[in-house]
Amino acid sequence: MATASPAADGGRGRPWEGGLVSWPPAPPLTIPWTWMGPSWGQHPGHWGFPALTEPSASPAASLGIFEVRRVLDASGCSMLAPLQTGAARFSSYLLSRARKVLGSHLFSPCGVPEFCSISTRKLAAHSFGASMAAMMSFPPQRYHYFLVLDFEATCDKPQIHPQEIIEFPILKLNGRTMEIESTFHMYVQPVVHPQLTPFCTELTGIIQAMVDGQPSLQQVLERVDEWMAKEGLLDPNVKSIFVTCGDWDLKVMLPGQCQYLGLPVADYFKQWINLKKAYSFAMGCWPKNGLLDMNKGLSLQHIGRPHSGIDDCKNIANIMKTLAYRGFIFKQTSKPF
């Protein structure tokens, strides 16, 4: 897949133009639905963030410590990242975008939100809630879609060879909203070791009846291709990339089994993001225990059953969404084949 190219406006382009915006991660906080109340944050709209407690005596004091740092437009491909910056100022580019969305009366000449007359505030408030909902998104990513994948395979102690994929889940994650838009999920019948071991069933939760009579890997790969086409992911103008928890799935497991069976590996499986590497870039530490460490480091609850392929995909998607909220831009980590 093609890599993103900088947009003409200095990298602040929309994702479908190949641009991206990057800024330091901001701590999660509540942004008010309106600035009509006597204090900052009186009418909070949460969007999943913990509430922010600020002194209510002086609105001006509150305004002095926060800068609405990144406001692009109402396309939904932007986010507000309030930062504790002291003397906050907008660039002329960001200010012009902010005024288009919020209305110029909400801003002083220097770009800092100010409390205007009651009539002006009421006028601006009519469309403010909808504008905030559109703006309160994520930093533009390099890809339109992330395809979250996590295989489960036959296994035993000691390890059996060759291993065979028995669960094949993919979540289509929108790169703008970081929401799951579509799911591909199939079980695969192993052919070399058709009988699952007790160790495998205990680890993955997959019982024999779940794989008996299921399609072969070749048939599943054909259905993956059909699903990719149906979802518009094969369009050359759509940028997408797989995301895995580690390199094993697409560097070892899939190419190894395809080689054993004499099957080709589609090009879209040859580029991916290793979530462990992305997390280490964002958080500054390596998640030794994979998803468990990443969920713990981000104060997230683990979803579902460990080593369930589809549940692991949901955890990966949740971790990605949380990192994106903090301003992280995901980049390909795999090297070209």
Curated annotation (Swiss-Prot):
Residues binding AMP: 152, 307
Positions of the Exonuclease domain: 146-320
EC number(s) on file: 3.1.-.-
Active site, UniProt feature: 152, 307
SMART domains for the chain: EXOIII (SM00479)
Source taxon at top rank: Eukaryota
Record keywords: Exonuclease, Hydrolase, Magnesium, Metal-binding, Nuclease
Binding annotation for Mg(2+) 2: 150, 249
Molecular function, one GO term: metal ion binding
InterPro entries in alphabetical order: 3-5_Exoribonuclease, ERI-1_3'hExo-like, Exonuclease_RNaseT/DNA_pol3, RNaseH-like_sf, RNaseH_sf
CC cofactor note: Binds 2 magnesium ions per subunit.
Keyword presence, Hydrolase: yes
Cofactor or coenzyme needed: Mg(2+)
Binding positions (Mg(2+) 1): 150, 152, 312
Subunit annotation: Interacts with PRNP.
Protein name, UniProt field: ERI1 exoribonuclease 3
